């Protein structure tokens, strides 16, 4: 080094870089240190700003300051080039050493030219309104002292004295001009600039506070490299201010969902391959990151190479100190640069992953909006959103590793070959033997993954259905039966997961034991070939083998990640390839031929499943004129709803054509099962349309909602809960109708909106709404209540999926074979004096109306979020779930594994020390530098020279060496191999035990969660959106199954690895222990500062997943309605808004991870440099043992990654433990039904204690919540065994509350209920409900066969099942579906709503319960079938006690007594005839009101 400096500066070799020359600084020192280095720094900082993003606004006008700085920078880049002209002058006229001036001039020119470009970029960025980054301006002024000192140096040399030479004189003039330009630059910088404008982006959250945001856009590259822009976010995390997603960072424009959706849609079209579209949209940027990966990988080899040189330097002691310093500096520099590059690579890959993630999730949701009739189950779609999308995007982290790891492997093998020659082949062969084993394992893992995902789909789908029907499940005490079905799916899922985990354990064992086995093989081979082991070769080989193991160890995971990505890609692609809803292809491009026609169908054949055996709907010809009211009638399952679905495009059109006038305006659709959003009543009615007060009032009046709103806590601002859980069936139907009416469409399709309301309300809806507000529109009305179709213009008669008759009501209605029409009923009433046979009272579910509602109308509260560190009890819960004995065994096996690994390495170091002591001073490598050498570079740095390729071959002797020192080689090898064998066994034990523990924890946590939720009261489900529960059963359970064990395994391995490393460092370099306290403090402070924010970000990320799940499930449930209303774009915007909230949390999490990583990497580089420096000092003092120092340095190289991995894995494990925390929250904190005991099998229940069937309420009081009125207020009555009791009352009177108290779905606040004089509060819930039966109004079916839905508990023979189906007139339907094993589809979608109700009635016929509760379950069947069913019920339950809530009064006229409720109190109780004959009785008033509602309407209508 000294010689090169002397040659460059033209000075004496003894003083190559003099600081002083006379009265001024040395010219060479000035040019190299004071000029070249500051200019190099200026160039680097300027280059960091070249990529500063431009503003989206027009380019701002340059103010004078920026102009002056740009001009000065450009001139300062020209002047040094002119200064190079003396190169062509004769030597005598040159102003200084030639190459010194050339080097200094080139560096200066490049620096200022780069600075000019950086200034130009900053002008067009948000910095253009200010002076720009201060650090950049300061760097521009750093070289100024060098200019002044150079000018003084020329003055000292007499440049201005004769004779005046052109070279020196011109250079002085240029120096003066440069000083003037620097002064101009300073004036330009000092000129005032405007305030800096904030970086603009595509805003979605317009209401967010700009003061709390941080953003990456507009930041300098220095800030980006150091992640300094995250400081405000981290500070908020420490202060505990990260409470909601809006508290996180603002998204960069390139990560904003709206921007990414536009970018991706430009490359995506229907039917395209997803991976091609992703590649076109983001592939170029992603592939470019491969260059960064390659450079970082190459620099990663600087550690082992420089370790080899440094250990050789310490061992031989013949090189100059400058070489040792150079090795230490190279080790530090290479580690730092590699860390920065690898960190930036990881950060940019994560950003690309986020971009692709938004594109995939947006595309999945957009496809969900376009799904045709053959759509997959909701649970499967939710799995695509959560599990499969995440697995697919793991490809981004695996692809570059897939080629980077083989490259790293090849370089490592070459370097290993340089160290040990052909002996490396023994280890290579051993490693290659595992490749086919790995292939077999990977294939099995892929196959098991596919099966596991199928079982997971089934489990999530079943959970979705279970949550939707939880009330019916509790009525029928099916918690055990359906819980067992979920457990069966979970068992199958865990069976596949068990295969995956044990195969993973085999991989872990093979690759964890491989380093020691390879080292043994190589060293034994090397010794047997006659070579002598040295510290240099051994520890360099150890470091290289560790680097060799990294790609070999990671390669199975990389391949596994790629395979999982492929599986998930195929699943997503199959979903995207499903037929889409396409109005352009479905409807005729031309409107109906006649302008007066609103709708026309001709020779049209429709089907729910084009390739299945589902019933077809055929319409030979149908023409509907504008403004007509068309009634549609027919038996249950005849195809009425299918006809409306065919008109809206929800069926497959197999042939014919459909023409709709004004198709672009959409339809007003009110479905048979009302779809209600989890929002306020007003929001449900507006449905995204602008609020019009006049229209809104008209709609409320027309839909008879004013009275309902008057009794709700917050009027139309009352939240209705998920799926309208707080509303009655009639209220849901009217709100759905009001939503359709408010949209002001030209064509309305109304699917039996009158079925769930009483006669008064039905009459009101008919005259005020259907014949009133909608009188100017075209209306198609399906109904079983034919008395309301007498005002229709045309009536359509459907039978077996075909339109068989069309005509006026007078012709069609008599053919329906219904109960006598209204005119006939009038005559019957007049002659017999009896009440009308068709009278309706609306059923109101009071507990749903009032449960969990506060005075502000808020029902669903925001999801709770824990704060601070994950509590210790969460870790204890996971420990208990894993099993205390198993968990302790895992820790012991880990400690033994690390102890034996350290023991093997220590024994190797001890062996080498003995070899060195026994050697006679000879060296195996003759190529060494003499002690007096002053060469700058060691020749051994040329590791990749062509000659080195042959050196190991030439140094391999053809015969075995006579001796390998005085040590007993065989003894040391045997001991080393024994320790390695024990290490291998401990590694195997650890892998197997951990796999078993992870499986045990996964099974236990899911079982506890499921059992707790099955035992939760219905009030919990009323106030908890199903998305929250499904999020736990999907994402959180998936995390516990896979991500958490993976990260916990890494954390434990890193922890024991750090203990072993510290032990080695302490034994080899005791002075290093002095650094541990401050180092530990720094690491603890950094990770504590980081964890405070990261864990909250992970929690927020989990919270923002739930709304995405709920929104998708809600969209799938209401797809026909929102498509008919043309609201798909608004729902897509809402999905983007929710996705942005989640994206913000994900981006902030990734950025904080990289913030931590770069700091840990740099601190680790500093520690490695300190260790190398201490080793160098000990060597100078003669205290270094090359064997121990080599061992310490080989371990120290892994210190950076180990410490970084430890903190990162601990933080990520803590983040994954948030999933355990969320599962434990529901497993421990969810309220439970009283006296909930472990569920018994139905075969193990006790002998029935209910023998008679009497029911008695004694002063029962029920309050849903403090501050709300009593739902039941001192109710007292008795029902005798076998008595038939009808229950009537107006809305909110407390009818349904009686059933809830009877079944103990709600506990009374006072009073008691007796069954056969037994207090129900003293009975177990399962025992109580086993003696009761219920027929609910809303049918609940789940995926499975007819047999499973009829008899989930498997208590009845097939003969009994067929008999029940026959009595309910469903036997023909069952035969057509394939018998009792016919599949019903998700939620019974293969049946019509009326058929579903009949199937639920068949369940009740199978029961042996003494008490039957009927909540009018025949509203959706035709009247003839209704009559037959009533006869069946009377016959089947003739000797049973029957309680019937009257929805239609004809169902209770034959009751023994009628109970009349008002405001939660019993006001009347007597026989129907007695109450009817009592003057001014409430029952008589209800009858009169019903009679008027059925037969008359407001005048003028």
Curated annotation (Swiss-Prot):
Its EC number is 7.6.2.2, 7.6.2.3. Disruption phenotype: Deficient mice exhibit increased sensitivity to paclitaxel-induced mortality associated with weight loss, decreased white blood cell, and small spleen and thymus cortex due to apoptosis and/or depopulation of lymphoid cells. It is found in: Cell membrane; Basolateral cell membrane; Basal cell membrane. ATP 2 binds at residues 1289-1296. The modification Phosphoserine is found at residue 468. It holds the Pfam family ABC_tran. Its main location: membrane. Expressed in all tissues tested including liver, brain, heart, skeletal muscle, kidney and spleen. Residues 286-564, 887-1215 form the ABC transmembrane type-1 domain. SUPFAM superfamilies: ABC transporter transmembrane region, P-loop containing nucleoside triphosphate hydrolases. The chain crosses the membrane at residues 32-52, 70-90, 102-122, 133-153, 172-192, 294-314, 321-341, 392-412, 415-435, 508-528, 539-559, 877-897, 969-989, 1033-1053, 1056-1076, 1158-1178, 1187-1207. InterPro entries: AAA+_ATPase, ABC1_TM_dom, ABC1_TM_sf, ABC_transporter-like_ATP-bd, ABC_transporter-like_CS, ABC_transporter_C-like, P-loop_NTPase. GO terms for molecular function: ABC-type glutathione S-conjugate transporter activity; ABC-type transporter activity; ABC-type xenobiotic transporter activity; ATP binding; ATP hydrolysis activity. Residues 599-825, 1255-1488 form the ABC transporter domain. ATP 1 binds at residues 634-641. Keywords: ATP-binding, Cell membrane, Lipid transport, Membrane, Nucleotide-binding, Phosphoprotein, Repeat, Translocase, Transmembrane, Transmembrane helix, Transport. It is a multi-pass membrane protein. One of its GO terms (biological process) is leukotriene metabolic process. ATP-dependent transporter of the ATP-binding cassette (ABC) family that actively extrudes physiological compounds, and xenobiotics from cells. Lipophilic anion transporter that mediates ATP-dependent transport of glucuronide conjugates such as estradiol-17-beta-o-glucuronide and GSH conjugates such as leukotriene C4 (LTC4). Does not transport glycocholic acid, taurocholic acid, MTX, folic acid, cAMP, or cGMP. May contribute to regulate the transport of organic compounds in testes across the blood-testis-barrier. Belongs to the ABC transporter superfamily. ABCC family. Conjugate transporter (TC 3.A.1.208) subfamily. This is ATP-binding cassette sub-family C member 10. It comes from Mus musculus (Mouse).
């Amino acid at each position: 080094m000294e010689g090169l400096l002397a040659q460059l500066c033209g000075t004496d070799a003894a003083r190559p870089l003099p600081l002083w020359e006379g009265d001024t600084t040395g010219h060479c020192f000035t040019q190299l240190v004071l000029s070249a280095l500051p200019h190099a720094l200026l160039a680097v900082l300027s280059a960091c700003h070249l990529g500063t993003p431009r503003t989206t606004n027009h380019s701002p006008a340059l103010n004078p300051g920026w102009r002056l700085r740009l001009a000065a920078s450009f001139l300062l880049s020209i002047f040094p080039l002119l200064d190079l002209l003396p190169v062509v002058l004769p030597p005598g006229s040159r102003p200084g050493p030639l190459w010194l001036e050339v080097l200094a001039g080139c560096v200066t020119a490049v620096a200022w030219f780069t600075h000019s470009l950086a200034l130009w970029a900053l002008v067009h960025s948000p910095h253009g309104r200010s002076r720009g980054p201060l650090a950049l301006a300061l760097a521009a002024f750093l070289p100024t002292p060098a200019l002044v000192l150079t000018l003084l140096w020329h003055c000292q040399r007499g440049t201005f004295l004769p004779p005046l030479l052109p070279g020196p004189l011109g250079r002085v003039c240029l120096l003066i001009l440069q000083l003037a330009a620097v002064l101009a630059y300073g004036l330009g910088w000092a000129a005032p600039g405007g305030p800096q404008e904030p970086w603009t982006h595509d805003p979605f959250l317009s209401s967010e506070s700009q003061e709390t945001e941080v953003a990456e856009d507009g930041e300098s590259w220095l800030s980006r490299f150091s992640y300094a822009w995250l400081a405000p976010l981290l500070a908020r995390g420490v202060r505990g201010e990260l409470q909601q997603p809006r508290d996180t960072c603002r998204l960069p424009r390139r990560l904003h969902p709206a921007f990414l959706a536009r970018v991706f849609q430009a490359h995506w079209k229907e039917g395209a391959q997803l991976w091609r579209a992703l590649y076109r949209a983001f592939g170029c940027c992603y592939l470019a990151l491969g260059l960064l990966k390659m450079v970082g990988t190459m620099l990663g080899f600087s550690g082992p190479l420089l370790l080899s040189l440094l250990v050789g330097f310490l061992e031989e002691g013949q090189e100059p100190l400058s070489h040792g310093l150079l090795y230490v500096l190279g080790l530090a520099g290479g580690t730092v640069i590699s860390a920065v590059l690898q960190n930036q690579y990881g950060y940019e890959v994560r950003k690309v992953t986020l971009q692709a993630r938004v594109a995939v999730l947006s595309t999945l949701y957009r496809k969900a909006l376009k799904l045709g009739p053959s759509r997959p189950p909701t649970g499967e779609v939710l799995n695509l959103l959560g599990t499969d999308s995440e697995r697919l995007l793991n490809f981004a982290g695996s692809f570059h590793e897939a080629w980077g790891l083989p490259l790293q492997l090849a370089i490592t093998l070459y370097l290993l070959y340089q160290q040990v020659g052909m002996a490396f082949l023994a280890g290579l062969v051993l490693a290659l033997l595992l490749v086919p084993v790995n292939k077999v394992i990977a294939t099995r893992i892929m196959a098991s993954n596919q099966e596991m995902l199928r079982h997971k789909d089934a489990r999530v789908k079943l959970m979705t259905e279970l949550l939707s029907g939880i009330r019916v499940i509790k009525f029928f005490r099916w918690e055990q039966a359906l819980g067992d079905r979920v457990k069966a799916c979970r068992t199958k899922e865990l069976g596949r997961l068990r295969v995956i985990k044990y195969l993973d354990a085999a991989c872990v064992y093979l690759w964890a034991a491989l380093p020691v086995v390879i080292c043994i093989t190589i060293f034994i081979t090397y010794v047997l070939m006659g070579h002598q082991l040295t510290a240099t070769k051994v520890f360099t080989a150890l470091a290289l083998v560790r680097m060799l193991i990294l790609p070999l160890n990671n390669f199975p995971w990389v391949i596994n990640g790629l395979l999982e990505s492929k599986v998930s890609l195929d699943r997503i692609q199959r979903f995207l390839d499903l037929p889409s809803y396409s109005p352009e292809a479905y409807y005729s491009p031309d409107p109906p031929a006649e302008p007066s026609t609103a709708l026309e169908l001709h020779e049209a054949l429709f089907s729910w499943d084009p390739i299945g055996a589902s019933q077809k709907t055929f319409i030979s010809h149908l023409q509907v004129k504008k403004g007509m009211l068309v009634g549609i009638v027919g038996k249950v399952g005849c195809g009425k709803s299918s006809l409306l679905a065919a008109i809206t495009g929800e069926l497959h059109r197999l042939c014919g054509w459909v023409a709709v006038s004004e198709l672009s305006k959409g339809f007003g659709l009110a479905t048979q099962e009302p779809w209600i959003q989890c929002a306020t009543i007003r929001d449900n009615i507006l449905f995204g349309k602008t609020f019009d007060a006049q229209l809104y009032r008209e709609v409320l009046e027309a839909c008879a909602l004013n009275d309902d709103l008057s009794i709700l806590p917050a009027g139309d601002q009352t939240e209705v809960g998920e799926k309208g859980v707080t509303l009655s069936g009639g209220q849901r139907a009217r709100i759905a109708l009001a939503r359709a009416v408010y949209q002001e469409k030209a064509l309305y399709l109304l699917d039996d909106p009158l079925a769930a309301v009483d006669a008064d309300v039905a009459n009101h809806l008919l005259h005020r709404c259907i014949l009133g507000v909608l009188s100017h529109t075209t209306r198609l009305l399906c109904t079983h209540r034919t008395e309301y179709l007498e005002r229709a213009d045309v009536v359509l008669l459907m039978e077996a999926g075909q339109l068989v008759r069309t005509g006026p009501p007078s012709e069609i209605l008599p053919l329906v074979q219904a109960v006598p029409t209204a005119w006939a009923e009038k005559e019957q009433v007049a002659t017999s004096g009896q009440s009308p046979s068709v009278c309706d009272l609306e059923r109101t579910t009071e507990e749903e109306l009032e449960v969990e509602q506060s005075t502000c109308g808020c029902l669903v509260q925001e999801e709770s979020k824990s704060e601070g560190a994950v509590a210790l009890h969460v870790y204890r819960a996971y420990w208990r779930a894993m099993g205390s004995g198993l968990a302790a065994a895992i820790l012991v096996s880990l400690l033994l594994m690390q102890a034996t690994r350290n023991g093997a390495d220590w024994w190797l170091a001890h062996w080498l020390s003995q070899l060195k002591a026994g050697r006679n001073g000879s060296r195996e490598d003759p190529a060494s530098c003499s002690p007096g050498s002053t060469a700058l570079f060691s020749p051994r740095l040329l590791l990749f020279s062509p000659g080195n390729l042959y050196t190991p071959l030439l140094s391999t002797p053809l015969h075995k060496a006579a001796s390998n020192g005085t040590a007993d080689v065989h003894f040391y090898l045997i001991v080393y191999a024994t320790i390695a064998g024990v290490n291998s066994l401990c590694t195997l034990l650890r892998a197997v035990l951990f796999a078993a523990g992870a499986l045990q924890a996964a099974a236990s946590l899911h079982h506890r969660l499921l059992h707790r939720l099955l035992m939760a009261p219905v009030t919990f489900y009323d106030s908890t959106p199903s998305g929250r529960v499904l999020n736990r059963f999907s994402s959180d359970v998936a995390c516990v199954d896979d991500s958490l064990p993976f990260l916990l395994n890494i954390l434990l391995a890193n922890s024991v690895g750090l203990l072993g490393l510290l032990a080695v460092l302490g034994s080899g370099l005791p002075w290093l222990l002095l650094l541990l306290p401050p180092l530990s403090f720094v690491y603890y402070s950094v990770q504590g500062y980081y964890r405070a924010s990261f864990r909250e970000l992970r929690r927020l990320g989990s919270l923002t997943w739930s709304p995405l799940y709920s929104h998708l499930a809600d969209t799938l449930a209401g797809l026909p309605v929102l498509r008919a209303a043309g609201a798909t774009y608004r729902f897509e915007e809402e999905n983007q808004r929710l996705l942005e909230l989640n994206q913000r949390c994900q981006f902030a999490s990734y950025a904080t991870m990289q913030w931590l990583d770069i700091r840990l990497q740099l601190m680790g580089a500093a520690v490695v440099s300190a260790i190398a420096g201490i080793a160098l000092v000990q060597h100078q003092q003669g205290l270094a043992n090359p064997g121990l120092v080599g061992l310490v340095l080989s371990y120290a190289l892994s210190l950076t990654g180990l410490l970084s991995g430890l903190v990162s894995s601990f933080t990520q494990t803590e983040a994954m433990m948030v999933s355990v925390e969320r599962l434990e929250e529901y497993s421990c904190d969810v309220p439970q039904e009283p006296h909930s005991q472990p569920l018994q099998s139905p075969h193990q229940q006790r002998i029935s204690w209910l023998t008679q069937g009497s029911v008695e309420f004694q002063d029962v009081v029920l309050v849903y919540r403090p501050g709300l009125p009593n739902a039941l207020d001192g109710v007292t009555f008795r029902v005798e065994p076998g008595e038939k009791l009808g229950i009537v009352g107006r809305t909110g009177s407390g009818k349904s509350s009686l059933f809830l108290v009877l079944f103990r779905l709600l506990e009374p606040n006072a009073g008691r209920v007796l069954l056969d004089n037994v207090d129900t509060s003293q009975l177990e819930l399962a025992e109580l409900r086993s003696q009761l039966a219920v027929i609910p109004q809303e049918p609940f079916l789940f995926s499975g066969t007819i047999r499973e839905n009829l008899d989930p508990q498997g208590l009845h023979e097939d003969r009994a099942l067929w008999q029940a189906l026959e009595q309910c007139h469903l036997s023909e339907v069952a035969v057509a579906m394939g018998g009792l094993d016919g599949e019903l589809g998700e939620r019974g979608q293969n049946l019509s709503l009326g058929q579903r109700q009949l199937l639920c009635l068949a369940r009740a016929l199978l029961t042996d319960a003494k008490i039957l509760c009927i909540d009018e379950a025949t509203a959706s069947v035709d009247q003839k079938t209704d009559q037959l069913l009533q006869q069946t019920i009377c016959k089947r339950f003739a000797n049973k006690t029957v309680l019937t809530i009257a929805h239609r009064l004809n169902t209770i006229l034959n009751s023994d007594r009628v109970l009349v409720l008002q405001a939660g109190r019993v006001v009347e109780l007597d026989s129907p005839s007695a109450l009817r004959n009592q003057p001014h009785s409430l029952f008589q008033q209800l009858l009169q009101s019903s009679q008027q509602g059925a037969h008359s309407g407001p005048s003028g209508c």
